[in-house]
């Protein structure tokens, strides 16, 4: 039996736009002691989202996105980096990309994985945080909810922001107008500052 307390599967069993802001301030944990507080996320929403890998339906690459919520979807970006996503259950093909973390523990291991990266850039960006946590293709499909896998996400008692800042997603060419990126207000650990947009604050329900 696991002594860990991962978020339960029910937490992920909703629309990615609901789950994404609720993941802010939760903690990504590795079994070797690496820990980072989630500061930036993006929602990807299946067949209604042209920027989602799952937009055109299930493929061998995206099969995990159409399975049970609470699993890890890992993919290669820019031919050089891995990125990690939590699969959601509100509709087929929904997932939340974890874009940035604030390092909390295991920083020596993160530095070893990332080389001479400055502390503030250890985990600010999807590729950087995946490298800092040693994530690769072998982690695709990992169940985040069991507490016995090498990675999980937990609640350490820090509440999600009541009014997270929302804005357009980064590094996509389609559906660029959708404000489905959320960040912790005032965090110094973001992949990129959030531009000021009308209605930039969003409720934690995703409405």
UniProtKB/Swiss-Prot annotation:
Superkingdom of source: Bacteria
Keywords: DNA damage, DNA repair, Hydrolase
Pfam families, sorted: Pur_DNA_glyco (PF02245)
Gene3D superfamilies linked: Methylpurine-DNA glycosylase (MPG)
Annotated EC: 3.2.2.-
Gene Ontology biological process: base-excision repair
Signal peptide: none
Record bears the keyword Transferase: no
UniProt GO molecular function: alkylbase DNA N-glycosylase activity; DNA binding
HAMAP family tied to this protein: 3MGH (MF_00527)
Family: Belongs to the DNA glycosylase MPG family.
PANTHER family: DNA-3-METHYLADENINE GLYCOSYLASE
Protein name: Putative 3-methyladenine DNA glycosylase
Source organism of the structure: Xanthomonas campestris pv. campestris (strain 8004)
Species lineage: Bacteria, Pseudomonadati, Pseudomonadota, Gammaproteobacteria, Lysobacterales
């Amino acid at each position: 039996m696991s002594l860990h307390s991962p978020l339960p599967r029910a937490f992920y069993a909703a629309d990615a736009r609901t789950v994404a802001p609720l993941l802010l301030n939760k903690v990504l944990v590795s079994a070797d002691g690496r820990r980072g507080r989630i500061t930036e996320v993006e929602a990807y929403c299946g067949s209604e989202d042209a920027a989602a890998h799952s937009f055109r339906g299930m493929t061998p690459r995206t099969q995990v996105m159409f399975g049970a919520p609470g699993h890890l979807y890992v993919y290669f970006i820019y031919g050089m980096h891995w990125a990690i996503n939590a699969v959601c259950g509100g509709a087929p093909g929904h997932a939340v990309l974890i874009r940035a973390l604030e390092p909390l523990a295991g920083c020596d291991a993160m530095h070893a994985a990332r080389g001479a990266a400055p502390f503030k850039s250890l985990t600010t960006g999807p590729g950087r945080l995946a490298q800092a946590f040693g994530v690769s293709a072998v982690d695709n499909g990992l169940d985040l909810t069991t507490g016995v896998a090498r990675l999980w996400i937990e609640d350490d008692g820090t509440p999600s922001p009541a009014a997270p800042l929302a804005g357009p997603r980064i590094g996509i060419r389609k559906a660029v107008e959708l404000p489905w990126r959320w960040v912790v207000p005032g965090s110094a650990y973001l992949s990129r500052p959030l531009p000021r947009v009308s209605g930039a604050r969003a409720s934690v329900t995703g409405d």
